[in-house]
Amino acid sequence: MNAPRLTDTTLRDGSHALAHTFTRQQVRDIVRALDRAGVPVIEVTHGDGLAGSSLQYGFSRVPDLDLIAEARETAERARIAALLLPGIGTRRELRAAVERGVQVLRIATQCTEADISEEHFKMAKDMGLETVGFLMMSHMRPPEFLAEQARLMESYGADCVYVVDSAGAMLPHDAAARVQALKAALTVQVGFHAHNNLGLGIGNTLAALEAGADQIDGCLRGLGAGAGNAATEVLAAVLDRLGINPGLDVLALMDAAEYVVAPIMPFQPFPDRDAITIGYAGVYSTFLLHARRIGEQLGVDPRAILIELGRRQTVAGQEDWILDVALELVRQQQTTPV
């Protein structure tokens, strides 16, 4: 195993868990702590990327562009990244984000739809950005298929392509097989992004590293969608124990998690029964809080909603299905004889 590059996504994936309420001061504090601890890339946007602030995905307390500007002004060494989902973020938002200081663009598509990212990669490269491809919900397709999609992203200009376990549904051998397939197919770097819905965020990341992953992601205190992500401070400790620490200050990251992030967290992401259901059913991790809220409003078990969403193979961008499924379950309850 080689020392990987770590991207911290507390200020993007963690936005889901905080209902997109990060403040300017919180961004400054988190970026400063990560930067001083040696984290090389820090991702900052709404949980659903540039222009994600909306009725569909939830409104941000502070506009993304303002948070990006705060991050760039605060970071002394780290590069600032942003996420963009084609169909949500547009050229206008990308240009504005670059003006505010974005240096790395991570372009995310469903793992079956890499072809919709071509113009976004080309525009980002024309603007001089480092580009990373994200194949979301990678558990839904076999390794060979993912490799074909990754080759498309490479041909469009991706400097790295990630296997993304959006549902936290993979087991270690799943993560390893997909990373191996991409390593065999690509000439660019390969990354892995984990979620912890089955309690395997760290384990799957290690399996990905053993399979040759060049880049990995983490969030301080595991703050992220569903049961959270692989915890940055834990990853740092594990990498150090393995002798492949890429320059991270392990103790400083522990302190950042404990004293900077933990006090602002409304809850500790954990594989509780609903989050486990996300991983078990293979559902997009961001659906968790929506399913809980709607389930409480309508008197429906969130797990029933999530399992049905998994059966229908819903993906990111189909949050409106959550209410539809819940209402259908209510109707079924009302027509079932007691």
Curated annotation (Swiss-Prot):
Keywords annotated in UniProt: Aromatic hydrocarbons catabolism, Lyase, Manganese, Metal-binding
Gene3D superfamilies according to UniProt: 1.10.8.60, Aldolase class I
Binding positions (substrate): 12-13, 166, 193, 284
EC number: 4.1.3.39
Gene Ontology process terms (BP): catabolic process; L-leucine biosynthetic process
PROSITE patterns associated with the record: PYR_CT
Major enzyme class: lyase
Pfam (any one): DmpG_comm
Identification of the protein by name: 4-hydroxy-2-oxovalerate aldolase
A single MF term (Gene Ontology): manganese ion binding
Native source organism of the sequence: Roseiflexus sp. (strain RS-1)
Catalysed reactions, as listed in the record: (S)-4-hydroxy-2-oxopentanoate = acetaldehyde + pyruvate
Active-site annotation: 16
Site (Transition state stabilizer): 12
Domain Pyruvate carboxyltransferase: 4-254
Residues where Mn(2+) binds: 13, 193, 195
Family, as annotated: Belongs to the 4-hydroxy-2-oxovalerate aldolase family.
UniProt cross-references to InterPro entries, sorted A to Z: 2-IPM_HCS-like, 4OH_2_O-val_aldolase, Aldolase_TIM, DmpG_comm, DRE_TIM_HOA, PYR_CT
